[in-house]
Curated annotation (Swiss-Prot):
GO terms for biological process: cell division; cell wall organization; peptidoglycan biosynthetic process; regulation of cell shape. Its cofactor is FAD. It is found in: Cytoplasm. One of its GO terms (molecular function) is UDP-N-acetylmuramate dehydrogenase activity. Belongs to the MurB family. It comes from Blochmanniella pennsylvanica (strain BPEN). NCBIfam families: murB (TIGR00179), PRK00046.1 (NF000755). This is UDP-N-acetylenolpyruvoylglucosamine reductase. The active site is at R162, S231 (proton donor), E328. Residues 16-185 form the FAD-binding PCMH-type domain. Pathway: Cell wall biogenesis; peptidoglycan biosynthesis. InterPro entries: FAD-bd_PCMH (IPR016166), FAD-bd_PCMH-like_sf (IPR036318), FAD-bd_PCMH_sub1 (IPR016167), FAD-bd_PCMH_sub2 (IPR016169), MurB (IPR003170), MurB_C (IPR011601), MurB_C_sf (IPR036635), Oxid_FAD_bind_N (IPR006094). It catalyses: UDP-N-acetyl-alpha-D-muramate + NADP(+) = UDP-N-acetyl-3-O-(1-carboxyvinyl)-alpha-D-glucosamine + NADPH + H(+). It holds the Pfam family FAD_binding_4.
Length: 345
């Protein structure tokens, strides 16, 4: 545990050079609650942070950053499933590797996602046809005001596409652990177009993991080398009537049917169609290999530069398609999270 003025460049994968008044590392629930309450009593803002892989600091932060490093991976099993109880401070990708090594399938499609376990329920992480909501049994969180620990069942988490009850209640709850249920009757999920060709093979979880590892490292920049937060925008979901109108104009537009009858579009394709792939805006840019990823390649771009590039993309896509992209990345200002609607209107 430590507390001191801190530069945040190493604590966000965009490598934005912002500062906070203080940073505290919490390895236990009581430490996390103690320092949150200490700042709250002083009227100071507090931001609970995991790996900083889904945030963009627009300016210096005037309060305390609480690094959630509550550890622990506990595995039990019965005849039908493995049940994992995982501390919020475990790295997500290390958890996936841990299960693969123990021959526990179910997380392989979610390989190589940066960040910590505690952040996974907030945005209902997903990749290659699998979302956290499909395997989450519960989320344990502390009500920061009452100090009580609450267990949210999967249904109570109100998971949606890149959204959950926690996304809108970040100032009230601190996630401390997540419960996962992985079925022993394993069936590969190969619906995603880049995995579809694997159906003809007798595929194993480890092989899917290895394949996704290769894909992601080809498509996405390593944040250690190039500042980025992965996909900056969510894939837009539209009604079928709007989709049909768009398909008449853009017959090659990729789309994905949703269970509720709506249509999900590829935000990356929309951006690329606007000829923005590789576009440079000051010290920020759009990644040449994946239009959905904004980069800070020299690690000298400011948060406002990256946000300005995102706004430029937003306006270009809106003008071309009348579709309004929404950021997946959380925007952090001087006193905390900023409602994206204030920037993307």
């Amino acid at each position: 545990m430590y507390e001191h003025p801190f530069q945040l460049k190493s604590l966000n994968t965009f490598s934005v050079n912002a500062f906070a008044k203080s940073v505290v590392t919490a390895h236990h629930e009581h430490t996390l609650l103690k320092f949150w309450r200490k700042a709250y009593r002083k009227g100071k803002p507090v931001l609970i942070l995991g790996g900083g892989s889904n945030i963009l600091f627009l300016e210096n932060y005037s309060g305390t950053i609480l690094l959630n490093r509550i550890k622990g991976i506990f595995i039990t099993e019965n005849e039908t499933a493995w049940q994992l109880h995982v501390g919020a401070g475990e790295k997500w990708d290390e958890l996936v590797v841990h299960t693969i090594k123990k021959n526990i399938p179910g997380l392989e499609n979610l390989a190589c996602i940066p960040g910590y376990v505690g952040a996974a329920p907030i945005q209902n992480i997903g990749a290659y046809g699998v979302e956290l909501s499909q395997i989450c049994e519960y989320v344990d969180a502390i009500d920061l005001y009452s100090g009580k620990k609450i267990r949210f069942t999967c249904s109570e988490c109100d998971f949606k596409y890149r959204d959950s009850i926690f996304r809108n209640c970040l100032e009230k709850y601190a996630i401390v652990s997540v419960g996962l249920r992985l079925c022993k009757k394993w069936k590969p999920i190969l619906d995603y177009h880049e995995l579809a060709h694997l159906e003809k093979f007798h595929i194993t979880p480890r092989q899917i993991f290895n394949f996704i590892y290769i894909i992601r490292h080809k498509k996405l920049p390593d944040p250690v080398l190039v500042g980025n937060a992965g996909s900056f925008f969510k894939n837009p979901i539209i009604d079928i009537k709007t989709a049909r109108c768009l398909f008449q104009i853009y017959p090659n537009m990729p789309y994905f049917y949703q269970k509720d009858g709506r249509i999900k579009l590829s935000a990356g394709w929309l951006i690329e169609y606007c000829q923005l792939k590789g576009y440079i805006f000051g010290e920020a840019a759009i990644y040449p290999k994946q239009a959905l990823v904004l980069i800070n390649s020299k690690k000298i771009a400011t948060g406002t530069e990256i946000a300005a590039l995102a706004l430029y993309i937003y306006n270009k896509v809106a003008d071309q398609f009348n579709i309004y992209l929404q950021p997946e990345v959380r925007l952090i200002g001087n006193y905390g999270e900023i409602n994206p609607k204030k920037l993307f209107m």
